[in-house]
């Protein structure tokens, strides 16, 4: 029984246990199947943000899984994923379970715990995530969030379209305005050469191209309107290579000037045909597109990439182009998605682009694992840091301090004026003490105290510098810090937190200082290192500092203690080639004036020391060619050394064969063996061959379209002795494609307008040739009437620094507007000076001679009569008792010296003594200003005497006038001299038939000084004198109108005499200078010259010879017989020391009418009425003189 029961019990137990076991198996299988069936792991995700997980997450993922998530973003966006949770089976090389992320250019493989918290960015707009698990050992898997992050075109270059189906154009929302000038800048790289290439086009509303930049059979051309403007001499097709290079094009309709900025240098040319076109609005701007030719677009577009295309509606200057940065926005079109319609397939993200955001590479050791299990097998992910101001880079590979600036506004209701920085600092540190992030306070400062309505309450603003010790590579956003502070306990001590804001401290922006040292954008307290210039084997350093006053970042000064400069280079025969290569590399960069001088000096040292073979000579020529690209201002100080170095170079070159030519972009030198026994003359020419950019030399004949031709006559060696002829072995030839090295500081008002060629026979000086050397040189710019002058570079001029000299050279009769032929009786550097200012057209040689004759005759007469006026008033004491006479004496003195200095100026200028010329110019300037000033003082005296209502006594009246009349001009001239003595010097005026200045003159050279101290100064005095002239004439005419004892004719004559008298006394005739412009300029120049050169004569006539009191003094002391005036005449009894106010009537008499026959009795009565200088009179005619 027991056995039976026991058996049934075991059977029941087994059946129930088996059922439960089977049920559990079924449930387990059902759950597994449900997990697998409910999780989709092969999907395409296109939402702007979201997340996905491994199957069954957070439970263990199933075995043998294979999943693929494709995250697709629109063009202009990248994909960013973050591993919120990650746990896979660990294994070396992730050979079992793994996640593979394809970012676009590289793959990253993860397993174990390594990816937890990691953020990755795609390089394009697609990212793929693959997950694979094997048959055993499952973990909980992963949870990944993703989002689309907008990126600018700064990170992307665009592939030039290879088919007409691909259109890269400006968006429809962008309207192209009417363009009469433009600047286009972009970066470009070529992958393959084509016969014709189009880079960009602009078409009008009808689809017709009105602007295109392209390569044609004629080279690089800019198509404007309907004209082709060649820029092949500025930029060749070979300059566009596989390396991305910036390029800017400018155009101005008014001048037809086309500029090209490439490789850090600016070149320009004139395209006159483009001046008639205006680019109409409403056009379509395309990258590539249909150019000006009829070639199929598929065959015409350039093969390569374009980047950072920007357009402005004005033409930038070279200085503006050189200062362009990535942040300079095109005001018509900019490199931004909002301006362009570009297919995503045409864009490529490239971290090497010049304006791309910072790129950081995550190294394999970033995840950090000691055992090696679960470490990434391959991890070469490139992660782009999105350029924002409030996002910390999530891919930081080093534990560095991150700085925040916090602004706290606190209300103090306890102590109004206290500084609570210590209390707030303690509160901040306590707040962050037990936080999960390591944050501490590095500084705090009180910025502002505002008194509120209640006297005991103030609102205070504090700035705090917070430092986050980032030891876990975990982001800390500003909002988290703000939230922490707002939720913190109260500050206490009567302080209440009103508001708080937290901002990530700005980085120090990318900077170039000094030249050649480019510092990348840097985080605060980080020190950057860049290679030294020119020696790049050492580094300079610079630290991004924190301003402790306002907690902003700034760059400290660079530390270049480890760097050495160019002057430290040691030159010897052994290292000459190495030094030359170094200097060529240095000169290929933009050099400052100081650096350029150092390079040229070192080249001169090298040429003097080394043996010059063809290879070394070629390198030296390259250096000088690079120097010639620098600004003319930078070349000025180095030109003498550079030219002498080239001269020495061609003398020392060792060569085999009949000749040697060394070419570069801006300089070509040639040396040819000379057979003195069979020399019958020679022709040397410089030209640019087809499909080349560097000039060449032909020693045998005149090349077609030669830039310069030198023909040496058969009699060239005739003046050499036999011993000299035996030593002659070579003919040297040099062609300079740029003229910056030939800067004449005393250029006679002329401008160099040709290439420069130089030729020599050995190192001998050849001059006084029987037959001249014929030099034919092309002009740099076309001119209808060039008026050329042939000159050569004379090293003996200007203290041996060199200058232009025309001795022994003349212009050939077969010269034209494009080329000039020079005939010279010696050999040296030759060029053509040309009057490009067109000043010679205003006054021709004939008129210039006439004006010069009038000026010298007039100034001589004026000086004589100014002296006569002065002597008259000095000789007769009674004439100089009144104020007007004393003022007139000062004015006559000033005019006398002005005319005398002017007459001596041209003669003294011919002595070529700089100090003497400066002295003469200073005195001429001074006496011109004193003349203006005393004319102004004349009008001021009239104002005081005529306009003031009551009698006036001014203490030391004439002394004060003298201080102003002589002191103000002296102060002005003194200031000019103190600022720069070079403001004065010798200049040339007028032009002769040979283009030379016909008149040497010591005068003001600086136009700013001239216009400020002469033109502006005189303008002020002139306007004042005009106003006074009008007032005086109104008073005189009003008085004359009340007189009934004169006829109308007499009144008119008296008024006319007053007008003429005042006109010359107040210098009104100097105003003719304001009208010497345009077609009437010559007429007013004659009027100006005649009247102003004779001003002293007119003053003598009207204010001395025709004055009745002067005539009486002359008659009394200088005449005899009947003409002599008796001593007992009315005049001899009349006092003249009048110090009262002049009536309008008497003023008119004293200035004009009294000189033309006013009665003696009338004048005498007026004088007697005012004998007492301090008496008060009710009579309106009382006077103050």
Swiss-Prot record:
<dbReference type="Pfam" id="PF00431">
    <property type="entry name" value="CUB"/>
</dbReference>
<dbReference type="InterPro" id="IPR000832">
    <property type="entry name" value="GPCR_2_secretin-like"/>
</dbReference>
<dbReference type="InterPro" id="IPR001759">
    <property type="entry name" value="Pentraxin-related"/>
</dbReference>
<feature type="disulfide bond">
    <location>
        <begin position="185"/>
        <end position="248"/>
    </location>
</feature>
<feature type="binding site">
    <location>
        <position position="89"/>
    </location>
    <ligand>
        <name>Ca(2+)</name>
    </ligand>
</feature>
<keyword id="KW-1015">Disulfide bond</keyword>
<feature type="topological domain" description="Extracellular">
    <location>
        <begin position="1081"/>
        <end position="1083"/>
    </location>
</feature>
<feature type="topological domain" description="Cytoplasmic">
    <location>
        <begin position="871"/>
        <end position="886"/>
    </location>
</feature>
<dbReference type="InterPro" id="IPR017983">
    <property type="entry name" value="GPCR_2_secretin-like_CS"/>
</dbReference>
<feature type="transmembrane region" description="Helical; Name=1">
    <location>
        <begin position="850"/>
        <end position="870"/>
    </location>
</feature>
<dbReference type="GO" id="GO:0060879">
    <property type="term" value="P:semicircular canal fusion"/>
</dbReference>
<dbReference type="InterPro" id="IPR000203">
    <property type="entry name" value="GPS"/>
</dbReference>
<comment type="similarity">
    <text>Belongs to the G-protein coupled receptor 2 family. Adhesion G-protein coupled receptor (ADGR) subfamily.</text>
</comment>
<feature type="disulfide bond">
    <location>
        <begin position="229"/>
        <end position="271"/>
    </location>
</feature>
<dbReference type="InterPro" id="IPR000859">
    <property type="entry name" value="CUB_dom"/>
</dbReference>
<feature type="disulfide bond">
    <location>
        <begin position="508"/>
        <end position="544"/>
    </location>
</feature>
<dbReference type="GO" id="GO:0005886">
    <property type="term" value="C:plasma membrane"/>
</dbReference>
<feature type="glycosylation site" description="N-linked (GlcNAc...) asparagine">
    <location>
        <position position="429"/>
    </location>
</feature>
<feature type="signal peptide">
    <location>
        <begin position="1"/>
        <end position="32"/>
    </location>
</feature>
<feature type="topological domain" description="Extracellular">
    <location>
        <begin position="908"/>
        <end position="915"/>
    </location>
</feature>
<dbReference type="InterPro" id="IPR017981">
    <property type="entry name" value="GPCR_2-like_7TM"/>
</dbReference>
<feature type="disulfide bond">
    <location>
        <begin position="532"/>
        <end position="563"/>
    </location>
</feature>
<dbReference type="GO" id="GO:0014037">
    <property type="term" value="P:Schwann cell differentiation"/>
</dbReference>
<feature type="glycosylation site" description="N-linked (GlcNAc...) asparagine">
    <location>
        <position position="763"/>
    </location>
</feature>
<feature type="binding site">
    <location>
        <position position="137"/>
    </location>
    <ligand>
        <name>Ca(2+)</name>
    </ligand>
</feature>
<feature type="transmembrane region" description="Helical; Name=3">
    <location>
        <begin position="916"/>
        <end position="936"/>
    </location>
</feature>
<feature type="glycosylation site" description="N-linked (GlcNAc...) asparagine">
    <location>
        <position position="818"/>
    </location>
</feature>
<feature type="binding site">
    <location>
        <position position="134"/>
    </location>
    <ligand>
        <name>Ca(2+)</name>
    </ligand>
</feature>
<feature type="glycosylation site" description="N-linked (GlcNAc...) asparagine">
    <location>
        <position position="470"/>
    </location>
</feature>
<feature type="region of interest" description="Mediates interaction with type IV collagen">
    <location>
        <begin position="41"/>
        <end position="354"/>
    </location>
</feature>
<feature type="binding site">
    <location>
        <position position="136"/>
    </location>
    <ligand>
        <name>Ca(2+)</name>
    </ligand>
</feature>
<feature type="domain" description="GAIN-B">
    <location>
        <begin position="658"/>
        <end position="840"/>
    </location>
</feature>
<dbReference type="Pfam" id="PF00002">
    <property type="entry name" value="7tm_2"/>
</dbReference>
<keyword id="KW-0807">Transducer</keyword>
<dbReference type="GO" id="GO:0005518">
    <property type="term" value="F:collagen binding"/>
</dbReference>
<dbReference type="InterPro" id="IPR013320">
    <property type="entry name" value="ConA-like_dom_sf"/>
</dbReference>
<feature type="topological domain" description="Extracellular">
    <location>
        <begin position="979"/>
        <end position="1013"/>
    </location>
</feature>
<protein>
    <recommendedName>
        <fullName>Adhesion G-protein coupled receptor G6</fullName>
    </recommendedName>
</protein>
<keyword id="KW-0472">Membrane</keyword>
<feature type="topological domain" description="Cytoplasmic">
    <location>
        <begin position="1035"/>
        <end position="1057"/>
    </location>
</feature>
<feature type="glycosylation site" description="N-linked (GlcNAc...) asparagine">
    <location>
        <position position="691"/>
    </location>
</feature>
<keyword id="KW-1133">Transmembrane helix</keyword>
């Amino acid at each position: 029984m027991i056995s039976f029961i026991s058996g049934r019990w075991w059977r029941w137990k087994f059946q129930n246990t088996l059922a439960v076991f089977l049920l559990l198996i079924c449930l387990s299988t059902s759950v597994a199947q449900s997990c697998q069936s409910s999780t989709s792991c092969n999907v395409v995700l296109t939402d702007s943000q979201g997340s996905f997980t491994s199957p069954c997450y957070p439970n263990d993922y199933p075995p043998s899984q294979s999943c693929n998530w494709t995250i697709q973003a629109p063009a202009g966006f990248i994909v960013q994923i973050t591993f919120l949770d990650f746990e896979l089976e660990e294994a070396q090389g992730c050979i079992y379970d793994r996640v593979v992320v394809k970012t676009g250019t590289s793959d990253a493989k993860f397993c174990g715990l390594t990816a937890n918290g990691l953020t990755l960015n795609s390089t394009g707009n697609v990212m793929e995530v693959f997950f694979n698990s094997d048959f055993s050992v499952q973990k909980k898997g992963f949870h990944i969030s993703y989002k689309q992050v907008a990126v600018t075109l700064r990170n992307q270059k665009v592939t030039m379209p290879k088919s007409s189906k691909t259109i890269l154009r400006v968006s429809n929302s962008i309207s192209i305005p009417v363009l009469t000038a433009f600047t286009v800048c972009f970066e470009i790289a070529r992958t393959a050469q084509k016969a014709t290439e189009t880079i960009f086009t602009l078409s009008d509303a009808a689809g017709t191209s009105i602007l295109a930049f392209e390569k044609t059979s004629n080279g690089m051309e800019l198509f404007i309107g309907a004209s082709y403007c060649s820029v092949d001499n500025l930029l060749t097709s070979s300059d566009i290579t596989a390396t991305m290079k910036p390029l800017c094009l400018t155009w101005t309709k008014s001048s037809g000037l086309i500029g090209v900025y490439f490789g850090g240098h600016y070149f320009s040319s004139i395209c006159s045909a483009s001046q008639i076109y205006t680019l109409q609005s409403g056009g379509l701007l395309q990258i590539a597109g249909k150019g000006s030719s009829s070639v199929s677009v598929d065959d015409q577009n350039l093969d390569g990439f374009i980047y950072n295309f920007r357009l402005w509606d004005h033409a930038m200057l070279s200085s503006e182009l050189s200062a362009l940065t990535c942040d300079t926005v095109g005001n018509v079109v900019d490199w931004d998605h909002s301006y362009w319609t570009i297919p995503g397939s045409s864009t490529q993200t490239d971290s090497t682009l010049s304006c791309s955001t910072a790129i950081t590479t995550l190294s394999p050791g970033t995840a950090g694992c000691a055992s090696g299990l679960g470490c990434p097998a391959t991890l070469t992910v490139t992660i782009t840091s999105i350029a924002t101001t409030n996002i910390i880079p999530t891919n930081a590979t080093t534990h560095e301090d991150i700085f925040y600036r916090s602004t706290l506004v606190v209300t103090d209701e306890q102590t109004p004026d206290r500084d609570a920085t210590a209390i707030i600092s303690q509160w901040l540190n306590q707040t962050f003490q037990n936080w999960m992030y390591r944050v501490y306070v590095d500084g705090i400062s009180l910025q502002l105290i505002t008194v509120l309505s209640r006297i005991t309450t103030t609102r205070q603003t504090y700035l705090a510098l917070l430092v986050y010790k980032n030891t876990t590579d975990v982001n800390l956003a500003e909002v988290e810090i703000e939230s922490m502070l707002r939720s913190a306990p109260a500050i206490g001590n009567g302080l209440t937190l009103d508001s708080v804001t937290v901002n990530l401290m700005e980085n120090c922006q990318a900077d170039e200082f000094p030249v050649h040292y480019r510092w990348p954008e840097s985080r605060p307290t980080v020190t950057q290192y860049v290679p030294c210039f020119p020696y790049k084997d050492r580094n300079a350093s610079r630290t991004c500092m924190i301003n402790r006053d306002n907690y902003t970042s700034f760059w400290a000064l660079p530390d270049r203690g480890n760097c050495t400069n160019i002057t430290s280079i040691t030159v010897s025969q052994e290292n000459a080639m190495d030094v030359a290569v170094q200097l060529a590399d240095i000169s290929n960069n933009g050099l400052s004036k100081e650096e350029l001088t150092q390079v040229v000096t070192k080249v001169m040292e090298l040429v003097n020391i080394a043996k010059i073979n063809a290879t070394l000579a070629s390198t030296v020529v390259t250096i000088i060619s690079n120097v010639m690209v620098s600004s003319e201002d930078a070349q000025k100080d180095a030109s003498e050394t550079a030219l002498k170095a080239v001269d020495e170079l061609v003398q020392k070159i060792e060569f085999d064969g009949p000749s040697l030519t060394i070419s570069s972009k801006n300089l070509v030198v040639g040396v040819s063996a000379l057979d003195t026994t069979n020399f019958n003359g020679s022709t040397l020419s410089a030209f640019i061959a087809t499909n080349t950019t560097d000039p060449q030399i032909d020693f045998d004949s005149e090349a077609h379209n030669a830039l310069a031709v030198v023909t040496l006559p058969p009699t060239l060696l005739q003046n050499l002795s036999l011993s000299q002829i035996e030593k002659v072995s070579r003919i040297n030839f040099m062609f300079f494609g740029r003229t910056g090295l030939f800067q004449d500081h005393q250029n006679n008002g002329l401008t160099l307008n040709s290439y420069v060629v130089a030729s020599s026979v050995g190192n001998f000086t050849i001059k006084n040739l029987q037959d001249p050397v014929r030099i034919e040189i092309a002009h740099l710019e076309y001119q209808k009437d060039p008026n050329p002058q042939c000159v050569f570079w004379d090293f003996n001029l200007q203290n041996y620094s060199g200058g232009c000299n025309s001795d022994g050279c003349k212009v050939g009769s077969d010269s034209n507007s494009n080329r000039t032929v020079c005939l010279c009786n010696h050999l040296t550097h030759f060029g053509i000076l040309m009057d490009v200012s067109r000043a010679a057209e205003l006054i021709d040689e004939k008129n210039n001679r006439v004006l010069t004759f009038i000026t010298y005759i007039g100034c001589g007469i004026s000086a004589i009569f100014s002296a006569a006026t002065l002597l008259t008033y000095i000789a007769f004491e009674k004439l100089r008792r009144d104020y007007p006479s004393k003022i007139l004496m000062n004015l006559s003195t000033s005019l006398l010296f002005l005319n005398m200095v002017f007459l001596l100026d041209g003669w003294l200028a011919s002595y070529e003594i700089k100090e003497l010329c400066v002295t003469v110019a200073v005195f001429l300037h001074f006496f011109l200003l004193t003349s203006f000033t005393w004319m102004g003082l004349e009008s001021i005296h009239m104002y005081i005497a005529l306009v003031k209502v009551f009698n006036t006594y001014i203490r030391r009246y004439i002394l004060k006038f003298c201080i102003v009349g002589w002191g103000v001009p002296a102060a002005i001239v003194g200031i000019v001299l103190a600022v720069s003595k070079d403001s004065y010097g010798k200049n040339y005026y007028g032009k002769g038939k040979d283009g030379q200045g016909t008149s040497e003159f010591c005068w003001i050279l600086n136009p700013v000084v001239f216009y400020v101290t002469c033109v502006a100064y005189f303008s002020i005095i002139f306007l004042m004198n005009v106003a006074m002239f009008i007032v005086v004439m109104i008073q005189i005419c009003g008085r004359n109108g009340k007189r009934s004892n004169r006829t109308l004719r007499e009144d008119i004559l008296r008024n006319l005499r007053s007008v003429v008298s005042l006109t010359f006394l107040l210098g009104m005739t100097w105003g003719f200078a304001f009208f010497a412009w345009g077609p009437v300029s010559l007429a007013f120049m004659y009027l100006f010259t005649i009247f102003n050169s004779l001003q002293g004569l007119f003053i003598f006539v009207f204010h001395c010879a025709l004055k009745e009191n002067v005539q009486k003094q002359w008659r009394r002391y200088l005449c005899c017989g009947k003409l002599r005036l008796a001593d007992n005449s009315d005049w001899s009894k009349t006092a003249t020391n009048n110090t009262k106010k002049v009536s309008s009537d008497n003023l008119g008499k004293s200035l004009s009418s009294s000189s033309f026959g006013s009665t003696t009795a009338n004048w005498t009565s007026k004088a007697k009425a005012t004998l007492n200088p301090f008496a008060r009179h009710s009579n309106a005619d009382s006077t103050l003189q």
